[in-house]
């Protein structure tokens, strides 16, 4: 009897069987799926928060640029940030806004293009969208927002920053 048990122990295979490995891999795949479904929404919320901070920075720089110009500026609605250089409508030919554009360019580190700002927007709602602004001369209020959410006005934008 002792010889029989000794022979069984000698012939005993070491390691895991293929079935055991497949079961472990299936369990791991299920766990990864559960974790990913819980983490992905938080990642997009983080990107949205970062986009909001980028727009807030643009709004702050625009408010500073308007204040530095010291000019009475006309109202603007739905102007792309890249129009601050005065080359495109609705700001074309308006030297007061061109001064603001030069100030904004200095404050923004030279990035005056909407494309340059879009590279900083990382959420799915912000990527590839134009960065627009409105200016109300009566109140001095500036709204900076992202297009592409049904229409190109501030009220329909998912991302909007209003100067106080």
Model-derived features: where do they sit?
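Surface-exposed intrinsically disordered loops and tails
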Residues: 80-126, 154
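Alpha-helix exit/C-cap motif
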Residues: 60-82
